[in-house]
C-alpha cells in the first residue's frame, strides 16, 4: 500500500513539474515580430530608399505565405545613393533577408500548395512594398498563433 502511494505521489509530482516548466521559445514568432520592427524602421527611412519598382505580393493564399515572403526577400530593395543612412539601411535589409526558422508542423501541406511565381505579382513603389510586407507579416503572425 505504501509503495503504491509513493508511486502515485511521484507520478503526480512529475506531471506537475513537467507542466510548470517553461516552454521553448517560439523562434518563428520571435523572428516574425522582429521583422515587423525592421519594416517599421525601414518605413521611417523610405525617402532614403531607391525609388525602383519592386515585386510586392498581395492577396496571398493561406499556404503560400512563406513563398510570398521569399519574393519580398528577393526584391532589390536598396538605399538610394544620396541617402545619409546607407549603412544603417543596408544593415536593416540584411536582417530582412535572413532565412525564417523552420515551422514545426504543416511543412508537407505547404509544399503541396501551388503558389504563384514572384514574377506574376505587381511591381510597386518602396512605400507600398513595405506596406504589403507588413500586411503579410501580420497575416503570418495571426495564422501562426491560431
UniProtKB/Swiss-Prot annotation:
Gene3D superfamilies: Interleukin-15/Interleukin-21 (1.20.1250.70). Glycans are attached at residue 85. It comes from the Eukaryota. Residues 1-17 form the signal peptide. One of its GO terms (biological process) is natural killer cell differentiation. Keywords: Cytokine, Disulfide bond, Glycoprotein, Secreted, Signal. InterPro entries: 4_helix_cytokine-like_core (IPR009079), IL-15/IL-21_fam (IPR003443). GO terms for cellular component: extracellular space. Disulfide bonds join 64-115, 71-118. Coiled coil: none annotated. GO terms for molecular function: cytokine activity; cytokine receptor binding; interleukin-2 receptor binding. It is found in: Secreted. Its main location: secreted. Cytokine with immunoregulatory activity. May promote the transition between innate and adaptive immunity. Induces the production of IgG(1) and IgG(3) in B-cells. Implicated in the generation and maintenance of T follicular helper (Tfh) cells and the formation of germinal-centers. Together with IL6, control the early generation of Tfh cells and are critical for an effective antibody response to acute viral infection. May play a role in proliferation and maturation of natural killer (NK) cells in synergy with IL15. Belongs to the IL-15/IL-21 family. This is Interleukin-21. It comes from Rattus norvegicus. The gene is Il21.
